[in-house]
Amino acid sequence: RACCTFSQGCLYNMNSHGRVACLDAATGRELWAVDILERFEGRNITWALSECLLVDGQHLIVTPGGRKALMAALDKRTGQTVWTTAPLGDDQTSHCSPILFRHAGRRLITNCSSAHGFGVDADTGELLWTAPLRNPFGTNISTPIYGDGCVFYVTPYAELGRAYQLRADGQGISAEHVWTSPLDTVTGAGVLVDGTLFAAGYKTSKWWFGVDWRTG
């Protein structure tokens, strides 16, 4: 269900049951595979998994949402665990995919669990911030969007779209809610271009949206 990720002659993919595989792109030969739900004691979600995996240097980023890890970095050459992010309460994984960006001199990764948007340090997996993203179905679908120090999370049916300003605070990063939009895109996320967020509405307003990134 998820797109493959290509890096240095290898393809990486996770199937709908949490099996992550590394394939030789030229031959299709499987080089290694790991069940991340089993390794990190996660449970599959109602409509199964569809995370597009993120390659960061020698790391492959996955979001098992298990009792042993909310997020994890695997060695992309072997599948061995490099770092983990501590679980976030009872949160499971979601249908979203992680993104990597730089803010305040740090490399950061953000994604969504079943009930939160969250951000971690890309080098250590340390959990830095969370933002509530609850809805009656207990899952989130749209991949976060980052731009100009803000990150945008959206969940359908409930809290809609919210932007958070990231602020460096000593050794940490906090996320301050700055605006809310009726935009409730559900499966396609959005695109940020020249200060405008473009995306399609779902239940609340079935329109195309162009949202000012600074004001909402």
Task: Outline where the language-model segments fall.
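Eukaryotic tandem repeat interaction scaffolds
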Residues: 164-198, 202-205, 209-215
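Short loop/turn segments that connect beta-strands within beta-propeller blades
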Residues: 24-27, 35, 75-78, 121-125, ...
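WD40 beta-propeller blade core
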Residues: 21, 72, 118-119, 162, ...
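Residue-level signal for tight coil/turn positions that link beta-strands
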Residues: 8-9, 17, 27, 57, ...
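Hydrophobic alpha-helical hairpins/lids featuring a short glycine-rich hinge
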Residues: 1-36
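Extracytoplasmic beta-rich repeat domains
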Residues: 1-5, 33-55, 67-68, 84-106, ...
